[in-house]
Amino acid sequence: KRFDMNYTANHIFPTSGAAGALAHALRAVTSPGDDVLTFAPYFPEYNCYVGMTGANLRVVPANTADFQVDFEQFEKMLTPNVSAVLINTPNNPSGAVYSAETLKKLAQLMEDKQKEYGHDIFIISDEPYREIVFDGKKAPYVSKFYDNTLSCYSFSKSLSLPGERIGYVAVNPTCTDADLLVPMMSQISRGIGHNCPSSLIMMGVE
């Protein structure tokens, strides 16, 4: 409701924090040998999350002027081997918040490349700092700009629950195979021995 999105329970996969959300989302939309792009500076554990899928993390150099996307570099690196783009806004460690203009341009470029390459390219949006913005700024909701978005969230920061390990993946209802991705993540969870988050903590957050 907050973001005017038509999510249903079929589009939400509860996880043990944002780390669990990223691990499941990446496994759901990548295959071994694929490339996953992210933008410098980035959270160093992305290396582990992507590496465990068998995919390759490729880092787009930072735009140090304002830490928005360097689109010239991004377009060069957005090759047919890319299956996902991992973004983090508000960003850890820079604190930068991607503007609506940046997200629109990012989405348009990725949509064009999907058509050119003939396959889906997903955005995996890492959003644990979504509520931590200052000076009257707002963090635009990434999934509003691009259909093939999986939003990964943690309540650790927004509710000060870092030790309780509670988060989720929200699959955009208009995403390709949206109704299949949550069941897929459920099977991934079983395969890697990843336990569901505590029902007690889920009730507390609710």
Task: Please annotate each region the language model reported.
Residues 127:
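Walker B catalytic acidic pair
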